[in-house]
Amino acid sequence: MIKLVLIRHGQSLWNLENRFTGWTDVDLSENGLSEAREAGAILKKNGYTFDMAYTSVLKRAIRTLWIVLHEMDLTWVPIHKSWKLNERHYGALQGLNKDETAQKYGEEQVHIWRRSVDVRPPALTEDDPRYEATDPRYKTLKKGEFPLTECLEDTEKRVLAYWHSEIAPTLKSGNKVIISSHGNTIRSLVKYLDNLSSDGVVSLNIPTSIPLVYELDENLRPIRHYYLSMDGEVPEGEIPKHISF
């Protein structure tokens, strides 16, 4: 049996301010730092260890992973970073307050942008200061690869390309893997692993910094999955609450 651990980054500063974040590189809040420490302690107490770690090129996910591995005394574990594990790109919504955006465009429209699978938010323009294609972390992207906006299907396409080329072979080689990433990135992976329909993924929420464990067979088909707490596996359908850490 193969075990895979997925973890969404701890609360970010823009999560706290209720803003659309996407590819904007904001850091963790104080609460997010605490959540990451708690996640590391949970994994350590439950006897987990890792051979390889994957994350995005955004600091909120990277820092969460650093803290988790530090709490587990596993700072030696190799970390692979890829833009393909970035959060969904929210286009021209990035930086905007979600409540204010709902007042401007209507709650129904914002809900469609946020939760639908195939509808993209308004796109950035290439002269927008939020367009960061020249950032050194994206120097390997070919012309036209840097997104101006994304729907969940777009996110899923790049995430699964990286899954099949990099992560799946690592798991099949017998390595214990943790992925520290973002809400929509993990939703994309869960949709694929659990073979969820487009309707099924609409209501799927991934909590910040709670370890989600997938037990997989030799072909990486899910046997079962569950969240972890200090007391071990959490009953199906329940999500543990954070404690002060």
UniProtKB/Swiss-Prot annotation:
Residues of the active site are H9 (tele-phosphohistidine intermediate), E87 (proton donor/acceptor)
Query: Entry's Pfam families?
Result: His_Phos_1 (PF00300)
Keyword annotations: Gluconeogenesis, Glycolysis, Isomerase
Looking at the keywords, is Lipid biosynthesis present? no
Root EC class: isomerase
UniProt pathway annotation: Carbohydrate degradation; glycolysis; pyruvate from D-glyceraldehyde 3-phosphate: step 3/5
Task: Indicate whether Isomerase appears among the record's keywords.
Answer: yes
* Coiled-coil annotated spans: none
Q: Which domain of life is it from?
A: Bacteria
Under the heading CDD domains, the entry gives: HP_PGM_like (cd07067)
Record EC number: 5.4.2.11
The UniProt entry's GO biological process terms, in alphabetical order, are: gluconeogenesis; glycolytic process
InterPro entries attached to this UniProt entry: His_Pase_superF_clade-1, His_PPase_superfam, PG/BPGM_mutase_AS, Phosphogly_mut1
- Which residue positions does UniProt flag as site: Transition state stabilizer? H182
What is the reaction catalyzed?
Answer: (2R)-2-phosphoglycerate = (2R)-3-phosphoglycerate
Question: Which residues are noted in the entry as substrate-binding?
Answer: 8-15, 21-22, 60, 87-90, 98, 114-115, 183-184
The GO terms describing molecular function are: phosphoglycerate mutase activity
Q: Which PROSITE patterns match?
A: PG_MUTASE
Its annotated function is as follows: Catalyzes the interconversion of 2-phosphoglycerate and 3-phosphoglycerate.
Q: Which PANTHER family match?
A: PHOSPHOGLYCERATE MUTASE
Record family assignment = Belongs to the phosphoglycerate mutase family. BPG-dependent PGAM subfamily.
Tell me what this protein is called: 2,3-bisphosphoglycerate-dependent phosphoglycerate mutase
Q: Which organism is it from?
A: Bacillus cereus (strain B4264)
List the gene name.
gpmA
